Structures are given as C-alpha cells and as structure tokens.
C-alpha cells in the first residue's frame, strides 16, 4: 500500500507512478483469441462444441448447447425464497431507475419552415455474456438485461459457461426475472464470436454486453465494429474521500469490498486528516486477518492500494478528477457540495450510509461502469446503450427555396457537382 501526502516533496512524481502502475500485465491473449474467433466464424457450431468440451469439460451435440425452458425453470426453483425476494427487490429498483432514463422523441418546425426531428429506436438483438462457475454474479444479469428490456430490445441471447455441466441457479433465476429465455451454456471468446458472427444455432446480435475474463474482453475488442459492445472492462476500483469523523472500520470495509474482487483491483483513501489515515490503515490490516478472500484482498491492497493525505477538499477533488475512478464514495458532512466539484467518476456514492456495495446490488443505477480512468470520456451502462438516434428532415418547396441556395453554394465549393444539381434543379422548377 502506498502512502502519499500532497504536502510532501515529490508528490507529483509519486502520484504519476500510482496512476501508471496498474494494468501492466504483459501477457497477450490477442493471437489465441483471434484464432478462436476465426475458427467459430469458419466452423460454427462444430467449433463451439469442441471448445466447450475442451474448456468446460462438457461434451454435447450442438442442439443441447441451448438450455431448455424446463432446465431454466428447474434450476431457478432451487433458489431459496429469501434470495428470490432479494433478486426481485434489486430488479424492481434497477428497472425503475432505467425507465426514468428513457428519452423522448424530438419534432419541431424551425424558422425556415423545415420540420426537424429525432427518433429513438431500440436495437433488434443484444447478446449478454455472463461469467459462469463459482464466480457467477446474478446481479450482472440484472444490470445488463433490464436496461435492454426497458429500452425495448426484443431479443436477448445470453451465454454463460457451465464448467463440468454445472448450472448456476441464481444466474438462471435472474435471467428468468428479466425475461431472458434464449440461454446457451457457452463461454469464453467462442461465445463472443458466436453472438457476433452467428452460427446455425445462434443468430447474430447487434451489440454484446457483459463482463468476462481477459479472453472475453479481448474477443469483444476484436469483434467491435462488426457489432457494438458496451466497454472493455478493467479491474474494479474505488476512491473513498473521508474525513476524521468516520468509523475507520467502515472505511476499511469499503476499501476491501473492492480489493476482494481481484488482485488487480484498486482501493484508494483520500483524507484531510493524517491521524485518521493511520487509523484507517490499521483497520484495513485487522479486517484482512479475518476476511475470507484475504489472499486476493491483501495482494490488491499491497500492490495497488493507496492512502493520500491532502491539505483541503479542493485538493482532494483535483486528485479524484485525475484518477477518474469507477466508484467514488464521499463520506463527508456535505457530500453534495464536494460532488459538485467532481467531473470524472463512473458513479458517486454520497454520505456515510451509502457504501459502494449499495450500487453493486440494490441502488438502481447500473453497476457496469468505466474503469482504468475511462470515466474521463465514458459513462456507465444505461438504456442509451440499447437505443439509437435517427434524425429526420422534412422540407416542402417553400422551405427548400429558403435554405437550398446556401446548400448549392457549399456543394459547388466542395466540387461536388451532383450534390449541387440535386438542389438547384429543384430550385429552378416553375
């Protein structure tokens, strides 16, 4: 864990090192992913069956790769009632928030008599990638599927690996809640390829969303342009801005809630109180002694964690904007005032009773957020990822006579004679 102080000599260099330190894994998966995608594109279902046997130790004919409605219902029925209630609560809140995001169409006539508009229409088909096995996350199903449903996407196809044939009941229950009926027991880059290019079994989709390992992320990168994708997700990250009035144990737990995700995850505390910084560091050490995922969390905290002592909240805001974190917790008396200074963050959690874990499950806004400082230019997943804009222009003869001459002049200036003629011939009639 790195300790930085903005009043110390060399802070700028140390902070630059902190920004550059993460995500330097040199292991390239580009070539094996490229080979898998080419194979799926060439051999289709046969390749899917081969990779499923190889990576998931599951040998099935192509027609059995789709999970039947009976299997989905049977697995979902195994979920305890309290967990189903929790899924329903999360689904209700996620759906409500994303429904409020839906934009309205635009239609007006301007001062030249030209009718202008903009229509929003949903994508036809979306592919959902869901990690499988023991590390399956039903919350990710809700966060990816529900915005698509709210947006009006008619077809949702989901791919989830089932190592050794084991299905995850919670994942299937979440899919059932979202109305996802087309589910395949396929994972990895091969699943991304199947959804992007299509096979006899799986019709191609228009956009692929959902988290995955390095192979899945690279596959999404390589199929982008053929289909849309949500983002290339990096390791999770949180920045906690806290004053000395906080319980150091709560701050420690919030930091470790990110650290336990992945050895590459990053958790950073920013505070104006140097004494509190020490108490928080000690609290992290104590929690790591009993945390079930202590090996992962300890590695993350040791390699990528940081505590930064600042001279003012204004300075804290500058650092947050430079970090552009995926998650920002503001544990201050006036969290809204501080948040007003923040330009770059995927999601902001305000107040001492709003840990980032609220947003992971039951807050309502999406937990699929920009990582690796991409919050400088990107946003979290929303209904806008599943709809697109089409602009409309309607002009009658009178309207064209008002604006057409300017168009003719510009077309001639660009040397595009047919463009100019398509306007001028209409203007010369009558």
From Swiss-Prot:
InterPro entries reported for this sequence: Ald_DH/histidinol_DH (IPR016161), Histidinol_DH_CS (IPR001692), Histidinol_DH_monofunct (IPR022695), Hstdl_DH (IPR012131)
Cofactor notes: Binds 1 zinc ion per subunit.
Alphabetized UniProt keyword annotations: Amino-acid biosynthesis, Histidine biosynthesis, Metal-binding, NAD, Oxidoreductase, Zinc
CDD domains membership: Histidinol_dh
SUPFAM superfamilies: ALDH-like
Active site residues per record: 326 (proton acceptor), 327 (proton acceptor)
Binding site for NAD(+): 129, 190, 213
Essential cofactor(s): Zn(2+)
Any matching Pfam family: Histidinol_dh
EC identifiers of the protein: 1.1.1.23
Gene Ontology CC: cytosol
Annotated disulfide bonds: none
A GO term, aspect molecular function: NAD binding
Transmembrane helix keyword on record: no
Pathway: Amino-acid biosynthesis; L-histidine biosynthesis; L-histidine from 5-phospho-alpha-D-ribose 1-diphosphate: step 9/9
Gene Ontology biological process: L-histidine biosynthetic process
Signal peptide positions on this chain: none
Entry binding sites for Zn(2+): 258, 261, 360, 419
Binding residues for substrate: 236, 258, 261, 327, 360, 414, 419
Catalytic activity: L-histidinol + 2 NAD(+) + H2O = L-histidine + 2 NADH + 3 H(+)
Function: Catalyzes the sequential NAD-dependent oxidations of L-histidinol to L-histidinaldehyde and then to L-histidine.
Record-stated family: Belongs to the histidinol dehydrogenase family.
The protein's name in its UniProt record: Histidinol dehydrogenase
